[in-house]
Amino acid sequence: GTEYTAPHILIETGGRPKKLGIPGEEYALDSNGFFALEEMPKRVVFVGAGYIAAELAGTLHGLGAETHWAFRHERPLRSFDDMLSEKVVERYQEMGMQIHPNATPAKIEKTAQNEYVITFENGESITTDAVIFGTGRQPNTDQLGLENTKVALDEKGYVKVDKFQNTTQNGIYAVGDVIGKIDLTPVAIAAGRRLSERLFNGQTDLYLDYNLVPTVVFTHPPVATIGLTEKAALEEYGEDQVKIYRSSFTPMYFAL
């Protein structure tokens, strides 16, 4: 192969959909497969508690598919405040989506009628036209040859970096999904810009603060957050230092 050398090398190889390792998982689609669909399934089961499953389930349900959303724990979107994830589930159920909490997939089988049956560890099974996994992503670090460097990875394969995006090898940096902090494209861009300003424009103290990044999940309705969740704030500052305010309102008649 061709050898390249440089004083600065940036790892920004992103991630890929994570497999569950269950029998019959080859019958399931991931987020890439979802966007390759040529026709809409009439019945669909989404598995996963994060952004991908939440958004895509809402999309197909809104288009008229019989939609099931299954996730391993009591509630989805667990990095958000309870009140937000509860509202998403409540609204989806009002719209007719079928929600399956505490449902861990055990296997997927294909029938003679070209249908799929997904069975969960709790014994529940659902017959459907498509199963779509939104069960997280894993970093693309396993084929980079990092074992030939001093770049350290964590137990999940993410590149370890400090607040300046430095890895444990001088001259090698990493940003984006490959570091496992906040897997959002604008965050990777912002981190990369700050890194380039630091390396090439003399702003030696510039770095991205990952603690105050706004994020939105495009569910129906969409939900957004920034900063600490209520639980995290209470754990960090104590109940006597945290005040919780809640407000609700009726949407305007002319609102879209």
Mark where each language-model region is.
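Short hydrophobic core segments
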Residues: 3-14, 45-47, 67, 126-136, ...
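A short alpha-helix-loop-beta-strand transition element characteristic
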Residues: 16-18, 152-153, 202-212, 239-245
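Structured beta-strand/loop patches that form or line metal/cofactor-binding pockets in enzymes
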Residues: 224-256
